[in-house]
């Protein structure tokens, strides 16, 4: 068997970016055959991807792609903030969102099956994702995407890599860009009060009613007069209407000029916003939190069991 030299290990590491000792083991197992060693590492990297698949991915990036009146917005998740700055991870995210815009996949499974190669992995986007899991050592996943091709003009805004907005509009592009920035900052849930989901309205009405009941209980305990049912009903409805104004885009005070609402700004610029989409990284994902001491203890326990 040919001697395994440091230069051979370095060459294999340069091709695969695998840990040094794994490269040495692969070369030893392959008896110095570089091609076979690379294949062995591909298998090992794939097994790493399988082990990582169950881990929570609450970090990540939002990325967008716009070309004429077609665009896409995508969330790609990973386990730690550190990986969000990795060039290979970012290249995967940017390539994927472009593929969405250009190929119109029906769902995440169709997206994963699209042809794509990167960093020696392929021939599909899913193969690259799995390969990078092994290479980087963290789970990563495509969480959600939306493609825009309604014929409306598009304006997008990314706040760093954690918040992404796409606005579908007719009219002034600068005004639409300002609206996208406003959405990122103020996070409305609907265009108008009428568009706010019924379950959110019901929840807010329930909160307002509970607050009114609590106030009545406090007043009774203090020997003070309790408000009439009519006044209480008006208070509850007033609270709901206040909430609707706070969460509907058109009724919000414009973030760049709080003397006017977004609706007033749009009217002044001759712009119509037809829809907006807001993505925030990790929204709705329960993030696993462990203190460092507990993490070290868990690793030591796992190592002891393995030995």
Curated annotation (Swiss-Prot):
Keywords for this protein: Cytoplasm, Elongation factor, Protein biosynthesis
GO cellular component, one term: cytoplasm
Region (Involved in Mg(2+) ion dislocation from EF-Tu): 80-83
Any single Pfam family the record assigns to this protein: EF_TS
GO molecular function annotations of the record: translation elongation factor activity
Subcellular location as annotated: Cytoplasm
Similarity remark: Belongs to the EF-Ts family.
Entry function: Associates with the EF-Tu.GDP complex and induces the exchange of GDP to GTP. It remains bound to the aminoacyl-tRNA.EF-Tu.GTP complex up to the GTP hydrolysis stage on the ribosome.
Protein name: Elongation factor Ts
Organism: Albidiferax ferrireducens (strain ATCC BAA-621 / DSM 15236 / T118) (Rhodoferax ferrireducens)
Lineage, broadest ranks: Bacteria, Pseudomonadati, Pseudomonadota, Betaproteobacteria, Burkholderiales
């Amino acid at each position: 068997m040919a001697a395994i030299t440091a230069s051979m290990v370095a060459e294999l590491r340069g091709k695969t970016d695998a840990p040094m000792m794994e490269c040495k083991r692969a070369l030893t197992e392959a008896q110095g055959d570089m091609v076979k060693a690379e294949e062995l590492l591909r298998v090992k990297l794939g097994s790493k991807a399988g082990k990582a698949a169950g881990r929570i991915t609450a970090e990540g990036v939002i990325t967008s792609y716009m070309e004429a009146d077609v665009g896409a917005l995508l969330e790609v998740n990973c386990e730690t903030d550190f990986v969000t700055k990795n060039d290979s991870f970012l290249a995967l995210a940017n390539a994927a969102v472009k593929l969405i815009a250009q190929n119109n996949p029906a769902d995440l499974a169709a997206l994963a099956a699209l042809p794509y190669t990167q960093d020696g992995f392929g021939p599909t986007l899913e193969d690259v994702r799995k390969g990078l899991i092994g290479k980087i050592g963290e789970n990563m996943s495509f969480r959600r995407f939306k493609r825009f091709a309604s014929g409306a003009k598009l304006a997008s805004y990314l706040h760093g890599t954690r918040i992404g907005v796409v606005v579908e509009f007719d009219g002034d592009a600068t005004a639409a860009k300002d609206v996208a920035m406003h959405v990122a900052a103020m996070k409305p849930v609907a265009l108008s009060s009428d568009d706010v989901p019924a379950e959110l309205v019901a929840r807010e009405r329930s909160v307002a009613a509970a607050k009114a009941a609590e106030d009545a209980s406090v007043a009774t305990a203090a020997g003070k007069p309790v408000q009439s049912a009519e006044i209480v009903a008006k208070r509850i409805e007033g609270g709901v209407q206040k909430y609707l104004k706070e969460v509907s885009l058109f009724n919000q005070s414009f973030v760049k000029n709080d003397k006017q609402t977004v609706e007033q700004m749009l009217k002044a610029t001759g712009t119509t916003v037809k829809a907006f989409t807001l993505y925030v990284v990790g929204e709705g994902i329960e993030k696993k939190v462990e203190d460092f001491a507990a993490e070290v203890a868990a690793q030591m326990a796992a190592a002891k069991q393995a030995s």
